[in-house]
């Protein structure tokens, strides 16, 4: 799909890609065709008045009649929308989506017999020109933050015929969900998917809604319902869980829609395909359209596209809505912040300015909670905002009878857009002006809908979670924390509520200390604030009760006033269990079922006919029982889990509120320091940078807390299902099974045309047992739930900030980083590569060889944990200091260097506090696994060598180690191999090191023929890969003993027995790059040497004369090995003097397989 990016607001009208077109209400606009049949009109949507009454304005909306009124704004809109379309088109599935929209022209209207008229067109002023249009993208309507998709004609949108459509779209304003910005490309994709429902004529009825959640915030039982299109398009957890063959998908919509679409597909074949009066291009477009099945459209959802585009999105529809909090909007500059790959710095790291419109957001809560005292005086008003969904008091489950005779119609195939052929579509010629015969009545009159609501109010004397949440929010920069809720709400804004006990204790403890007016004092204060906040917000506690062992979050009670009687959350949770966390506890409705009786007409059937018919009934009953299961599952998801999910949302917001308070305290202290100290400007810049990094680290700790919240409430929800719902389900199911078995048995016993043996066989064959149903095993349910309820709240970035790789190309060596952090890697061309423990290792030999890795993730500071690990092989003695790896600037940071035949790790802060750890001799030419882990919360430095903890140092006095964004790997006159250099943004524990160490080692071990690890001092026979059945033996010639093979089956030749010896007598297993000596057991012990006369391998008596070989495995054949001496391979020669000799020399004519050797157990 080609996107026309060469358009601007001043592009001249050519009546092809730029035209003045008529709208449905006879207004005229300048329109731009940016792709076949896809147009952009950079104007506000004409169907809504830009000036509306206050009562017509939506909650959370923004209204500005002047938005998008100047030519500059209109051009910006045009360019932004084009860029988003280019971004979508830049991905294969996005290009397929746009191609599909381009081809999905509505079926022509049959005006008279063989007289077909187009309904998808735009017209010029005097109807002189017509332009094919499937969709037209406008700016927003009256509410400038609302995106919408409007069909031209409802009848065509629902009948299978299809209709063109209009999109209202706002590209400039976005909002955050938790820590990431919502990508406008995904918002546009949502509109584009929805447009396919209209173009294909498969729009569901407006009343087809899905039970979505029980509204926990109301006293009465009220429900939210999700429109079918929004449900299908959103995807995510709801779609996965509720789409496991859900019973409500057995709806006439899915049956009728498929039939309607097939009707028009058939009409195309009969009436259109060979109609000479219809333009060929129209027929080609329709042919492409009907290659797509309706089910292909139903399968398209945002979850799929978000993964294909690597865009973060909320995994529950409810997550994206205004609920308990207000969105803040940010402005996107498409030249500075965005390109065809998305946000230039990612959805988290991009920094967007807040919109000026945030002060103009319409505030219309759905519910106002008045906290009153015993005198009915209002102490506090808290707002709860709508979730944007249709509300109802009808309990869907109490009225719904599970259908017995309707089959499940919709299944997910996961073959997304496989039938869309972009290349074929691009070859379709455009539909010309003269090809269009317009049908004038192609559009309904657009009538805007305004949601006029009035807030409900409730009074409560017990503070609700929303009251506690509101008390934690403050706009003032003058912050004083208090753990006394009543004192806070009585303070008229001078206090803010906090449950961070350690943090408040620390602030109280230092309240009367001397002013913080030096960088060192500030660093110590900042570090203490960070540590105490981390301890508070990530606190968990293991408990055991009748519901099992679980990890709870003690502060939840204090944060949201849940089970908070005298701060006894832990005890009350122990006693009452997870069901006590929610308000509405008895919601399960026993499903209404209706199972048909077995027809009496079958009583006289023969055994064969009866078997077949009873089997069909058995299958139908089996499926019906599954429908009952999904009914229970849906009820739990919508009525119980939705309440726990509300608690997840509120608790997460509480964490973010506390984080905001702490950050304001830090910023306040930083301002004081800058205004009241004599610190140099250079140090102030450093303090600012360090504070920024600490604020980032605080956000990371908050994310850990949010993850804890997620796990805690999800586990609680699962526990409620297991203990409160599942027993009712199993009891009901067992009774259903018992009744079905009973009626089946009674019927069979009445049958007159079969004998007793046949009756017994049929009864056994058509009776159910509990073992027939996986869902009667609670563990299967747990597995399903755990699979679907890991909520994606924040970008799950890799902990790796550097992950070194190296490989050889034809003309040069390539070194790079696989961490995904956009690291700049600079290195000289003379850097060598050798094969290391698992992969290529970098060989540093020359003076001042330097590899530089640059990215801003390397900037350490005061509070961030990090780890460094790598494999190291040192080939040289180092008596004087020689640098190896480091990240230092102005003598601040960390580095690793050689000195006195050992390795030294040095860390030094900006105040000169320093720690040096000397590691014992590692110059024995062996590979060593080095791990260095810095834990700033525990003030702990751990160093491991080969899985052994060699250093455990206190680094309490080390403060700010802010250094540059560069890590250097250099050769300061070293001779070393480095493999797998990695830097992580977290600590590494001993178990992780153990796993990684032995995983690497396991891959580094040399294997024998049976894939077993080779061992030193163990006896083997040696074979060459070319002759894998003929062992190496000895040949005596000219007073020398050489190695060869017995290629004449001479029984006098006996295979030699070999042992591998290592220079380190304590080493047991053979690894790659080991230096080995071969011992040969031939009467007396002999050793392998290389003849200086002919380069043959010969036997010598003295071990001191033996040659030391380097042993390696073959990359492609794991049970083969190679042997080298001075980088020259040992191989089996071609036949010479009747023998194939074992030789070590440079012979380039020898096949590579001759270099491969095999050791077999004896």
Swiss-Prot record:
Stated role: Assembles with botulinum neurotoxin type E (BoNT/E) and protects it against pH-mediated inactivation or protease activity at pH 2.6 (the pH of the animal gastrointestinal tract) but not at pH 6.0. The non-toxic component is necessary to maintain toxicity.
Official protein name in the record: Non-toxic nonhemagglutinin type E
Matches recorded under InterPro entries: Bot/tetX_LC (IPR000395), Clostridium_toxin_transloc (IPR036248), ConA-like_dom_sf (IPR013320), Nontoxic_nonhemagglutn_C (IPR013677), Toxin_rcpt-bd_N (IPR012928)
Keywords linked to the UniProt accession: Virulence
Gene Ontology terms: biological process: proteolysis
UniProt record similarity statement: Belongs to the botulism non-toxic nonhemagglutinin family.
Molecular function via GO: metalloendopeptidase activity; zinc ion binding
């Amino acid at each position: 799909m080609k996107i026309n990016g060469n358009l601007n607001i001043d592009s001249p009208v050519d009546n092809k890609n730029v035209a003045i077109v008529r709208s449905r209400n006879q207004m005229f606009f300048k329109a731009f065709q940016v792709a076949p049949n896809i147009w952009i009109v950079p104007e506000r949507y004409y169907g809504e008045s830009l000036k509306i009454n206050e009562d017509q304005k939506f909650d959370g909306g923004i209204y500005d009649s002047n938005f998008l009124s100047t030519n500059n704004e209109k051009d910006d809109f045009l360019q932004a929308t084009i860029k988003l379309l280019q971004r979508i088109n830049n991905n294969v599935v996005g290009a397929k989506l746009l191609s599909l929209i381009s081809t999905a022209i509505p079926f022509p209207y049959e005006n008279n017999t063989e007289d077909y008229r187009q309904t998808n067109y735009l017209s010029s002023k005097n109807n002189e020109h017509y332009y094919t249009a499937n969709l037209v993208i406008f700016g927003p309507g009256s509410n400038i933050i609302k995106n919408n998709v409007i069909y031209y004609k409802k009848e065509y949108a629902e009948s299978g015929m299809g209709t063109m459509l209009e999109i209202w779209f706002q590209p400039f304003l976005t909002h955050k969900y938790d820590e990431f910005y919502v990508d406008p490309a995904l918002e546009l994709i949502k509109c584009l998917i929805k447009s396919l429902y209209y173009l294909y004529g498969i729009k569901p009825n407006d009343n087809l809604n899905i039970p979505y959640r029980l509204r926990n915030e109301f006293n009465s039982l009220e429900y939210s319902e999700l429109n079918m299109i929004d449900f299908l398009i959103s995807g995510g957890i709801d779609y996965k869980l509720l789409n496991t063959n859900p019973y409500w998908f057995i709806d006439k919509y899915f049956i009728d829609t498929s039939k309607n679409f097939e009707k028009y597909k058939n009409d195309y074949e009969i009436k259109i395909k060979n109609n000479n009066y219809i333009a060929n291009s129209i027929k080609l477009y329709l042919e492409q359209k009907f290659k797509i099945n309706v089910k292909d459209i139903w399968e398209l959802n945002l979850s799929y596209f978000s993964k294909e585009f690597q865009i973060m999105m909320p995994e529950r529809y409810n997550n994206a809505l205004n609920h308990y909090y207000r969105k803040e909007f940010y402005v996107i500059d498409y030249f500075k912040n965005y390109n065809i790959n998305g946000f230039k710095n990612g959805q988290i790291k991009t920094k967007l300015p807040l919109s000026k419109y945030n002060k103009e957001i319409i505030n219309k809560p759905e519910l106002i909670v008045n906290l009153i005292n015993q005198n009915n005086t209002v102490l506090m008003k808290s707002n709860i905002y709508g979730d944007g969904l249709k509300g109802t008091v009808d309990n869907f489950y109490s009225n719904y009878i599970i259908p017995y005779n309707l089959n499940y119609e919709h299944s997910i195939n996961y073959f997304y857009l496989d039938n869309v052929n972009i290349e074929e579509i691009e070859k379709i010629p455009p539909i010309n002006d003269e090809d269009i015969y317009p049908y004038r009545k192609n559009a309904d009159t657009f009538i805007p809908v305004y949601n006029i609501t009035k807030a409900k109010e409730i009074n409560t004397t017990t503070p609700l979670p929303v009251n506690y949440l509101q008390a934690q929010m403050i706009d003032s920069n003058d912050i004083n924390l208090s753990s006394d809720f009543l004192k806070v709400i009585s303070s008229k804004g001078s206090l803010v509520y906090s449950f961070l006990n350690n943090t408040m204790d620390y602030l109280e403890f230092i309240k009367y200390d001397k002013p913080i007016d030096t960088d060192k004092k500030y660093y110590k204060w900042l570090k203490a604030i960070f540590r105490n906040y981390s301890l508070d917000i990530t606190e968990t506690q293991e408990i055991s009760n009748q519901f099992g062992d679980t990890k709870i979050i003690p502060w939840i009670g204090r944060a949201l006033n849940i089970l908070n009687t005298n701060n006894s959350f832990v005890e009350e949770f122990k006693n009452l269990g997870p069901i006590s966390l929610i308000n509405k506890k008895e919601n399960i409705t026993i499903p209404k079922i209706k199972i048909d009786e077995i027809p009496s007409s079958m009583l006289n059937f023969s055994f064969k006919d009866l078997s077949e018919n009873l089997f069909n009934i058995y299958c139908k009953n089996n499926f019906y029982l599954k429908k009952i299961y999904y009914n229970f599952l849906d009820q739990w998801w919508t009525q119980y889990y939705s309440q726990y999910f509300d608690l997840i949302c509120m608790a997460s917001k509480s964490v973010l509120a506390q984080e905001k308070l702490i950050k304001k305290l830090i910023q306040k202290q930083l301002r004081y320091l800058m205004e009241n100290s004599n610190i140099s400007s250079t140090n102030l810049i450093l303090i600012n940078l360090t504070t920024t990094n600490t604020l980032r680290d605080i956000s990371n700790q908050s994310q850990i807390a949010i993850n804890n919240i997620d796990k805690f409430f999800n586990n609680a929800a699962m526990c409620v299902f297991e203990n409160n719902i599942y027993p009712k389900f199993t009891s009901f199911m067992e009774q259903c099974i018992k009744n079905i078995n009973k009626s089946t048995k009674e019927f069979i016993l009445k049958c007159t045309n079969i004998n007793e043996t046949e009756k017994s066989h049929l009864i056994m064959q058509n009776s159910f047992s509990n073992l027939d149903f996986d869902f009667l095993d609670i563990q299967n349910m747990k597995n399903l739930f755990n699979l679907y309820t890991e909520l994606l709240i924040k970008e799950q970035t890799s902990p790796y900030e550097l992950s070194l790789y190296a490989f050889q190309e034809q003309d040069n060596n390539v070194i790079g980083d696989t961490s995904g952090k956009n690291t700049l890697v600079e290195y000289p061309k003379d850097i060598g590569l050798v094969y290391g423990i698992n992969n290529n290792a970098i060989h540093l030999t020359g003076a001042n060889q330097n590899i530089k890795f640059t990215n801003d993730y390397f900037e350490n500071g005061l509070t961030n944990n990090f780890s460094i690990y790598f494999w190291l092989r040192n080939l040289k003695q180092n008596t004087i200091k020689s640098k190896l790896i480091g990240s230092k600037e102005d003598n601040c940071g960390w580095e690793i260097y050689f000195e006195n035949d050992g390795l030294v790790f040095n860390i030094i802060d900006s105040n000169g506090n320093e720690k040096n750890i000397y590691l014992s001799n590692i110059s024995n030419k062996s590979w060593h696994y080095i791990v260095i882990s810095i834990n700033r919360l525990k003030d702990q430095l751990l160093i491991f060598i080969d899985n052994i903890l060699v250093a455990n140092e206190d680094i309490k006095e080390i403060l700010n180690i802010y250094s540059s964004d560069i890590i250097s790997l250099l050769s300061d006159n070293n001779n070393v191999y480095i493999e797998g250099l990695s830097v992580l943004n977290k600590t590494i524990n001993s178990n992780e090191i153990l796993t990684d160490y032995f995983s690497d080692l396991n891959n580094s071990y040399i294997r024998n023929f049976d894939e077993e690890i080779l061992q030193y001092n163990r006896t083997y026979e040696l074979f060459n890969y070319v002759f894998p059945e003929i062992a190496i033996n000895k040949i005596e010639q000219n007073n020398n003993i050489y190695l060869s093979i017995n290629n004449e089956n001479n029984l006098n030749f006996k295979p030699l027995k070999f042992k591998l010896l290592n220079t380190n007598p304590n080493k047991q297993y053979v690894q790659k790059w080991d230096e080995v000596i071969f011992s040969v057991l031939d009467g007396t012990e002999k050793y392998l040497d290389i003849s200086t006369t002919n380069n043959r391998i010969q036997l010598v008596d003295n071990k001191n004369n033996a040659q030391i070989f380097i042993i390696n495995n073959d990359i492609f054949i794991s049970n083969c090995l190679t042997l080298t001496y001075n980088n020259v391979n040992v191989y089996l020669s071609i036949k010479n003097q009747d023998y194939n000799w074992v030789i070590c020399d440079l012979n380039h004519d020898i096949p590579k397989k001759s270099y491969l050797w095999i050791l077999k157990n004896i």
